[in-house]
Structures are given as structure tokens and as C-alpha cells.
Amino acid sequence: SVVLSTLLKYRKVIPCIHPAAALREYLARYNIVNDLRRAKDQAGFPEVKHLTRDLILNPSFADTMSFLDTCNKAKEVAYDIEIRGQELSHIAFAINPSVAICIPFVEGMKDYWAPDQEASVMLKIAEVLENPEVAKIGQNLSFDATFMYYKYGIHVAPLQDTMIAAGILFPDFPKGLDFLVSLYCDGEPYYKDDGKEWFKNPFASEEIFRRYNAMDAAVLMEIYPKQVKELERMGNKITYDRQKSLLHPLVYAGNKGIRMDTEGMVKAGEGCNERIDGLTRELAEASGRTDLNPNSPKQLKEYFYVDKGIKPYTRKGSISVDDKALKRLAMNGHQEADIILKLRHERKMLGTYYNMKLDEDGRMRCSFNPVGTEQGRISSSKTIRGTGANLQNQPPETQAMMLADPGCLLINQDLGQAENRVVAYIAGEHRMINAFEKGIDIHKQTGSLISEVPIEEVTDDQRSDGKKANHGLNYDLGYKSFALIYQMPEKQAKFIVDRYHSVYPGVRQWHNSVREELSRQARTLVNCYGRKRVFLDRWGHELFKVAYSYCPQSTVAEKMNQDGVLFIYDRQDLFPEVQFLNTIHDSIRYQVPLSVGYERIIEVIKAVKASLEKPITWRGQSFSIPADTELGFSYDKKTMVEWKAHYVDNTHDDKLAEELEIYVREQAA
């Protein structure tokens, strides 16, 4: 913000983060430098120069219809919605950075329009939003487009999203509109709190809130063109286009949701309560105290570190009784810590999962975020109505309660050991590559190499150690953290970590090459799909660990998004029967009506499998990740049929269709 000082007459002021903050939060240095550069530029002239904006805040019916007609003829417009009580209260449109309108639907506690006028306005809004010739620019359109689709059946298209662009350009930075305005809008005074104040008091100034809404649309027309130039300069415009194309399938899947076994959730919650009661009694017996509250950090610190005299565990310089600290205490034989961890787990299962608020039709829905993680993965959260949950991190217990719609079959197809395979090929680790290409059990091989026993003699425990190593050590996890995560003695963890890197030397050689590339290429890495990421945080081990994970994680995300989600959603000419439901990092979920026939279901499975298994190319070498398939009437792995990739490859379609028919009959019996 560039504003006039209230203390020094005729002086301009630019609020700035204190430079000392960069010592604690390294990324703040970029904001500080940006503000100081702006201060230098602003020092060249005395005036406060802000872009003049013509904001229509009290539109007549004629004004509104005329403006929307203008929008309908534009190449692109920006829009922003505001919601109150799950109803559309305002919508703003901008045709350029200087001209915008706020179309209100409420004024205080009254309607702004007569019923016939409101109907005409909404129809005209729908015409603009669905016009295929007019690009709609927005911020976090997953929210806006979901609401307009859920509430009015309006399918907003085509879309351009400044939040997605921000997530591609600078994954380390905030993606909120307030931050983007500070970055791209040349000193525009901060206005975002105006909206928050109105929501606290809807009887406050209508004009202030309407200006806030109109500004949100106007600034988008200023921000987006600058982002496009940066994306093109960075070589990430294609990456942005790919990520943006996920909006429509994610809006569809978020609104579709999945049917839940509501009776099963109630019963599971009752069982959870019984276990909580039992664990509470166990804790009282183990501690000798009936008043010890497992949710009180103050009481737990006092109990473990004062009463019991244990040396305190710290986190960022502060005494801690978080889950990591409790795991360490439990590993050292303190039974109370183990009981508290179990209590926390049961309470989370009860509060977060079994007692979650579903929609009235008994479905779990979510809101997907196309740039929810820094590495390109999709994330999800509760819906804008406060129902549902993160659909991607549900534990096995609640996944087992996810049901197919009547007459449908659920299908889950996942990439086998996807990240591990990508690591093997980009690291050039020949032992790993050999195992994957010859179909050798990679966990068994790693267990064999660590334990120095023939692979045919590897025990279940040794294979388990191999599996833990394969899952945990590709990104330079230290032995102490490895011990904590897998709850084993540090001596054993150190042995496994050292042996792993001894038998797979290519992994640490690859780490060296990543560090060299960061240094040589201005902190920039490129994944197998050409997606570039600049790593801006403090140079050192923590940044390096994130960088090691970038190429494998983002490559798998791109593979799943392009050859899974978009392949199914965009090719409705091939898959008119397929209903896309969810994507979870390295897997895709959908359902198909049984009425299409078993042969057709096998055709669909094989087509999706072939798409997922398209080769990935890394520096001249191509490799493929096999896709396994699970089928069932719920996502309970105990009741699903599992077909490994090689089994589907080597089994005739008629045989697979016959197996599926037998399974369906058995489940119906």
C-alpha cells in the first residue's frame, strides 16, 4: 500500500515488515525487498498515484443489464461472488482494471431487486458466465464455480484463475488476493478488511462492502495479465494451462461426492466412545491421577517433566508434549504417553471422521484445491457449506464406509510404488530399476540387501524394514527422524539408513546432482513434464530435502492429473458412463453403472490403465509406472477384488469379465 501519512503532512507512507523478521522467517525478505524497491520508485515524485477506478456500486436495473451485455461481448471479464447464509449476496464483474460493477442482491435485510428483475439479472449473469467466447478470470474459482454450479446449475467456462497462476509461479508465497494485490497492483491501498468488517456487521455501510466486492473483480484484471507474462517468461504457461484445466472435473467431483454408510458411522462412533472410556481408565491407573487431562499441554508438561522428572523434549526452542514428544516418551517405556497417543487417535477418529457433518443426502462432499500443495498435488477440504471433509486423507475405517451408488461399481486404479519408481529412474539407481523391470518385490529386495540375506530367505520383519526404508529414505530423512516415525531404537534406525544408502548409492548421488542443479540454475528445478519450480526459502538442508522430493512428487501428480483425471473427464466421447469421484495423489477413483455390461467395464478399466501407463520421459530415457486395479461396492479393501497390472495384461478380457460377474453375484448373495 502507498498511502498519505496521518502524522507527517504531505508525506507518502509504505507499510513494510520489519527487516529483523527475515531472520526468523526467511521468505519475508522477498516482501521486504519488494516494498523497499517500491519506496525507492515512489521517492521520485511527491504525489500518491493510484489507478483511477470507476466502480458502479448502486446500479439500476438498466445499468446492470447494460453492463452484463458489455461483458457478453468482451474477450475476458473478471468476476467475484460474495455469499451470506449460503445465498448469493453480491456478484461483481470487471471489464478492465478501471471499470467494474457490484450487483447486489440484498440491501440490509431486504432484497435489492423485485422478483422479476432478479430473475432477469440472474439469467443474464448465467449467460455471461456460460458464454464460451468470454474467458472468466477469478481468484480461487474452485470456490466460486462450485457455488454457482451447486446453487444454480451454472457451468462457468472458460476459466482463468489467479490463485492457480500464483501457485505455479511462487509456491512458497501466499496465494490470497490480498498478497497478490500487494505484489501486482502498484501500491493499491489495502482494502480487504472492509469485507471482513461487513460480515461482522451486515448493517454497516453497504457502499463500503460493494466497493470491496467490485475491487476484488477490478484488481483481477490488473493481476492476471502480469501473471501471464511471468508464466511465459518462466516457461510455465503450459504448466498453468494444465493445472487450470483441472477446475471443471474437480468442481464436478466435489459436488458429486460419495455415498456413505451412515448407520456404520454411528456404530463406529459408539465403539470409539467405548474405547475412549477404557483408555481413560487405563490412563488414570497408569498415572495414579484421575484428573490428568490428555488434551492439556500444561498438565502433561507438568506431569512428565516436573512430577516424573523426565528431561523435556523441545520443539523450536519450546518445551513440547506434541505427538512427536509423546512418541519419544513411549519409546522410552512411559506407558502413559502411549495411552495418551491412543486416546488422541480415538478422539480424532470420533470427532473428525465418525461424527463429520454429511450433506442431507448422506453423501460426503469436499472442495478441491488445484494448487493445494507446493509440489503440484491437489488437496481437498470441507465444502463451502461446512459439510464433508478432506476426501483424500480418509483413514481405512471411513474408506470402508464409502459406498457405490445403487447399481454402480466402484473402481480404484493406482500407480504401483509410483514415487519410488520415479526416484529409481531419475537417480539412475540400477538395482532399483532392475527390480522394477523384472517384477522383483522391491521391499523384499531392499530387506534382503539391508539384512544381507538371500531374497528368498527374507522374513516378514526384514521385508517390513525394507518397505519402511523405501518409503522414508529417498528424500534424505535422518536416522533420528526415521526412528521416531517408525518407532524403533535409534541404533536400529541408523543401521537401516546407512545400509540403505550403501546398497542404493545412486540415491545420494542424485541428491548431490539436485543440489548442484539448484546452485547452477538459479534455484530452479524441472520435473519430467517440464514443470519448473523456484525454491526461495533459506539455503540449506531443509530446502534441499524439499527439493529432493519435488521431481518425484510433482511428476506423479502431473501423471495422475493429465492421464487420469483429465483423460476420464475430457473424453466423455469414450467414457459417457464413467462418473469421476476422487483422486488421491497416485490413484484415481470412479464408478460405472453395472447396466453397461461387464465387457464394457473391462474396456473402461483397460483404457484408463493404458492412459496411466503411458511412458514418462526423463533426459532421453522412458519408463512406465504400472497401474493396479481394485473393484467393489465399497472402498473396503477387505471386500474389493484386486487385479495387479501384470494380471490384467496377461488375462483375456472375457476371463476378466467372467471374474467380475462372479464377484458381483457373490456380493449380491
What residues fall within each predicted segment?
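Glycine/proline-rich loop-helix segments at beta-alpha junctions forming the active-site rim
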Residues: 1-50
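A short, charged helix-loop
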Residues: 9-21, 182-208, 217, 221, ...
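Acidic, low-complexity intrinsically disordered tails
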Residues: 46-58, 62-65, 112, 636-669
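Mixed-charge, glycine-rich, non-catalytic linkers/tails in nucleic-acid processing enzymes
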Residues: 47-55, 156-162, 168-171, 192-293, ...
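Conserved RNase H-like, two-metal-ion catalytic cores of nucleic-acid enzymes
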Residues: 48-179, 183, 273, 424
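Acidic, glycine-rich two-metal-ion catalytic cores of nucleic acid-processing enzymes
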Residues: 73-99, 108, 115-120, 127, ...
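Core structural elements
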Residues: 89, 140-141, 187, 212-227, ...
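Extended, well-ordered alpha-helical scaffold/bundle regions in very large, multi-domain proteins
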Residues: 238-336, 475-514, 600
